[in-house]
A protein has these predicted regions:
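Signal peptide-directed extracytoplasmic domains
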Residues: 61-102, 113
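An amphipathic alpha-helical core segment
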Residues: 157-204
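Immediate post-signal-peptide N-terminus of mature secreted/exported proteins
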Residues: 27-71, 83-86
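Bacterial signal peptide processing site
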Residues: 19-22
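Bacterial N-terminal signal peptides that target proteins for export
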Residues: 1-6
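A cross-kingdom marker for long, charged
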Residues: 26, 200-237
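Mid-length scaffold segments of soluble, non-membrane domains
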Residues: 90-164
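C-terminal motif of bacterial Sec signal peptides marking the signal peptidase cleavage site
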Residues: 14-17
Length: 237
């Protein structure tokens, strides 16, 4: 369903590239949408599609159960993980990893209003540039418009989620245990919140990019009157 919602977005953009939709002839009896109607259809399709995409991640196992997005310990902590598993302390590591993923799953839901603001701010020029651009043009648009806000908004949310799911505690237990080993020379303390923020933002954009790369040949989902009008006309062309 998510792919079909996003497909409607690209079809709408195709309509927007016409100089004046209202001056074109009628095709196969389908009413010709105005520029305003086409823009409305585009925004509706985007809102539905982004909502579905966020929904893929904002559920239990959205990160933990998906190998494409599953979070492990930060790169700087890989030595810690390997050492503790060799010493029979893998359970402590696994518990920390699980709760880190639960925190990310909880936090990504807060991305929705940020994406919706970017959609509402999209101009006709933005839409034309997207359709004329590369296959990931929409993802690039969202990266440009939302990355800074997503990172800023996610930072306190991720910290709260890490505490809510005790991920901070379990992670600190792992780090403290490793740092207290007599053989540990270089004590480590990687920044967990910044790591999770970066991974969560990357996962959101990756979800959009994956769909964008495959949507052009998927069936159309027309879920409102305006979408049926806009995309019924597009199909008749």
């Amino acid at each position: 369903m998510f792919r079909s919602y996003i497909l409607t977005f690209f079809l709408a953009i195709g309509l927007l590239s016409c100089e004046t939709l209202s001056k074109l002839p009628t095709y196969a009896g389908s009413a010709i949408p105005t520029d305003a109607e086409a823009a409305t259809g585009l925004r509706q399709a985007l809102e539905q599609g982004v909502g579905k995409g966020i929904g893929v991640l904002n559920v239990q196992d959205g990160f933990f159960g998906n190998q494409a997005y599953k979070l492990f310990l930060p790169a700087d902590a890989q030595l810690i993980e390997n050492t503790m598993r060799q010493l029979g302390m893998g359970g402590m590591v696994d518990r920390a990893i699980l709760q880190i993923n639960r925190s990310a799953e909880d936090a990504v839901g807060y991305a929705r209003p940020i994406f919706l603001d970017a959609i509402r701010d999209m101009t006709i020029t933005d839409a034309i540039n997207i359709v004329r651009g590369p296959r990931d043009a929409a993802t690039q648009y969202f990266r440009q418009k939302t990355t800074e806000r997503l990172t800023a908004a996610f930072s306190p949310v991720i910290r709260a989620s890490l505490d809510k799911f005790s991920a901070t505690k379990y992670y600190n237990d792992v780090i403290s245990t490793y740092n207290n080993f007599p053989t540990t020379i270089n004590k480590l303390n990687p920044d967990l919140p910044s790591y999770v923020v970066g991974k969560a933002v990357d996962a959101l954009f990756d979800q959009i990019a994956r769909e964008e790369a495959n949507i052009r040949e998927n069936p159309v989902a027309r879920t409102t009157d305006i979408l049926r009008k806009v995309f019924g006309w597009a199909g008749a062309r």
